[in-house]
């Protein structure tokens, strides 16, 4: 299985990562976007019309094709970031980061204590 670590390794090696953005709520469309040669598909919950149930199904479809599922959450809120990660997103794009404090809050929302504030509820990981 390809994981978010794959993207970090690609970027660390100076390689580009080709990604696509999904803004409509369709697991089938997300699976079609996860074609060979694509490194990630980002499910856009900020400007797309995708709810939590759609996110779960879309991340499963993307991951099933061996592509990294990430999501752009609607806002820099710890509960939204944690919920996206619990749904199966292997990375998050957090909008409206304007200060160092905003960035620190977003990072803390991705990490479990003591390094962060993310609560434990890995719904997808428990399956």
What are these regions (language model features)?
Residues 16-22, 41-43, 69-73, 92-94:
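Hydrophobic faces of well-ordered beta-strands that scaffold small-molecule active sites
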Residues 1-19, 23:
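N-terminal amphipathic alpha-helix/helix-capping segment at the start of soluble metabolic enzymes
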Residues 22-35, 75-83:
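Short, acidic/polar
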Residues 23-25, 46-48, 74-76, 97, ...:
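Active-site beta-loop-alpha junctions enriched in small/polar residues
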Residues 36-40, 86-91, 111-112:
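Glycine-enriched alpha-helix->loop->beta-strand junction motifs that scaffold or abut catalytic
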Residues 79, 91-127:
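Conserved anion-binding
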Residues 52-78, 82-86, 110-115:
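Alpha-helix-loop-beta-strand connector modules within alpha/beta enzyme cores
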Residues 29-57:
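Glycine-rich, proline-tolerant flexible connector loops at the mouths of alpha/beta enzymes
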């Amino acid at each position: 299985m390809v994981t978010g670590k794959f993207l970090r390794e690609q970027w660390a090696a100076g390689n580009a990562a080709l990604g696509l953005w999904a803004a409509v709520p369709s697991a089938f469309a997300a699976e079609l976007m996860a074609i060979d040669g694509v490194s990630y598909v980002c499910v856009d919950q900020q400007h797309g019309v995708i709810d939590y149930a759609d996110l779960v199904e879309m991340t499963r479809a993307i991951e099933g094709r061996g592509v990294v599922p990430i999501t752009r959450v609607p806002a820099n809120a710890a509960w939204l970031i944690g919920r996206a990660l619990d749904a199966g997103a292997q990375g998050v794009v957090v909008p409206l980061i304007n200060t160092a404090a905003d960035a620190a809050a977003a990072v803390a929302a991705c990490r479990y204590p003591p390094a962060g504030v993310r609560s434990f509820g890995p719904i997808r990981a428990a399956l």
